[in-house]
Amino acid sequence: MIPSDHFVRFYNEVFKFLDQKKGLTDFYLEISRHQEIHCLELFRKKGLEGMEEYWGHIRKEENCVSESWIDGDVRYSHMKRCPSLSKVLDNDAEPFAGYCEHCPGWVGPLMAKCGFYFVDNIMGERVPECRSFMTKDREKAECLLKEWKKQYPEGNFRTNFELLKAQK
């Protein structure tokens, strides 16, 4: 098995290559399709609780410094120190500018298949921190996004709203 220190370096270089070849979006969609094996039914059956179950396991496995919580019909996550980007920043290769795009790149389409609106705020391409939320309520998602844009004016927001619109 390849150690995570090496894996993220490899990922970083693959992202650079695929970006040059204009294939990065397709790669993220393929990752999303593969992730369905692990979590699509869990998210459909258990909703936000299933997401807590899945990402709680990932948080431990990848040694993430993060917290998540459910407030009513919204699941929030705050990745305080992303281990993946931290490792990319701590090596001799130049980090791919869009490294953090891989998370919303695969999570957004998966959330759309489950009927959830997803917003991710990537704090900066060299800042290993992000915040996200998921909800089935479109109005609430739009309202929360508007609030976050005020709260984090320097934010780099990604949503899956268009994917959900296309499904309806």
Where are these regions (language model features)?
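Anion (oxyanion) recognition and catalysis
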Residues: A112
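N-terminal accessory segment detector
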Residues: M1-E101, P109, Y117-R131, T135-K168
